[in-house]
């Protein structure tokens, strides 16, 4: 899968609502601090974590499929071996609800086969890249 161009990244960063799969309740962890940064930048962040009821004073959902509102971008902070299941949920939302325009896998997270399925469905994909780093670089 090709690396996203700066123009593609800028387009993805224009989305408003970001579901963060693996969002953490623990300050100091990337899965907490990066979503907090995104909130501070004006994004509507939706935490997805089955072990938390609330993160950042927002409802935390058990799975991506439980999020009732429209989601533009899914940002993933889970191990690479969990990506195929996450992509299944992304594709189900995309097919049934017509949302999820982009999938972003954070540093160290990669699965070419699973993300190719998302790309084949017309979803923009970024792998092994930090959304905060790219936001700071491009915005």
PLM region spans:
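Conserved SAM-binding strand-loop segment of SAM-dependent methyltransferases
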Residues: 58-63
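S-adenosyl-L-methionine-dependent methyltransferase catalytic core, i.e., the SAM/SAH-binding region
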Residues: 26, 33-43, 78, 121-124
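Rossmann-fold NAD(P)-binding glycine/threonine-rich loop
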Residues: 107-138
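Haloarchaeal acidic low-complexity proteome signature biased toward cell-envelope/secretome components but also
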Residues: 1-13, 139
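NAD(P)-binding Rossmann-fold cofactor-contacting core
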Residues: 24-28, 37-56
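Phosphate-coordination loops involved in phosphoryl transfer and adenosine-cofactor binding
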Residues: 14-15, 100
